[in-house]
A protein has these predicted regions:
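Alpha/beta enzyme core
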Residues: 1-210
Length: 210
């Protein structure tokens, strides 16, 4: 990705559960930066985020609807009640105090997202919470229309790439069927597809193997 997008800000995910200690997290964080990442997305514990941040690794944290914790809340907006909003905001301040540089704010009410953005030093990256965050993000399969499942309310499809991929797949299948039919009917290969050997050279070959 870095090779084709040299000017893009890349926050590379440290998949939840792939490391089992703060030391491993720090090591993996440095590996991500060495690969060309600008920041490390991390939804692990505050302690781990703090350990990575202390080593100078820019961390992108996550509040609101956090997919790997969705079994706690289901896939729904988070922060619509005063108590939930307070918990989300407290999470933001805890992450800020731990040294995170950015925070994804996902599927929270626009009022809460606006308040968070105005009251944190972190860069806020919003999805599903209006236009009040510092930056916006969407998943590429939503943008390009390759998502075969449910499209969330906040998503916007710009291109129906799935339909184009289905057309391409139909053409692939058609091409393979044409090849099989052509081969079975004797239409392929034709003489123009063959490599010819000089007759004298072929005679010499036959002499050599006698």
């Amino acid at each position: 990705v870095r090779e084709v997008a040299s000017g893009a800000f890349l926050s590379v995910g440290l998949k939840h559960g792939t490391v089992s200690s703060k030391q491993e997290a720090v090591k993996k964080g440095f590996e991500i930066l060495e690969m060309g990442g600008d920041a490390v997305y991390c939804s692990h514990s505050i302690d781990w985020i703090e350990a990575m941040a202390k080593e100078g690794i820019p961390i992108t944290a996550h509040v609101g609807l956090v997919p790997n914790r969705a079994t706690w809340t289901n896939y729904r907006a988070v922060g619509k009640t005063a108590d939930e909003a307070l918990q989300v905001y407290q999470n933001v301040k805890d992450l800020e105090n731990a040294g995170a540089a950015c925070v994804e704010v996902e599927v929270v009410p626009v009022e809460l997202a606006d308040f968070i953005t105005k009251n944190t030093k972190m860069i806020t990256m919003g999805m599903g919470c209006g236009d009040v965050c510092d930056t916006q993000y969407l998943f590429c399969n939503d943008i390009l229309g390759t998502n075969t499942g449910h499209y969330p309310r906040h998503a916007k499809k710009y291109i129906d790439l799935k339909a184009e991929e289905e057309k391409l797949q139909a053409l692939r299948e058609k091409g393979f069927r044409m090849f099989v039919e052509d081969m079975n009917s004797g239409g392929y290969p034709e003489s123009k597809h063959e490599i010819k050997m000089d007759s004298i050279e072929f005679e010499k070959f036959q002499e050599k193997i006698k």
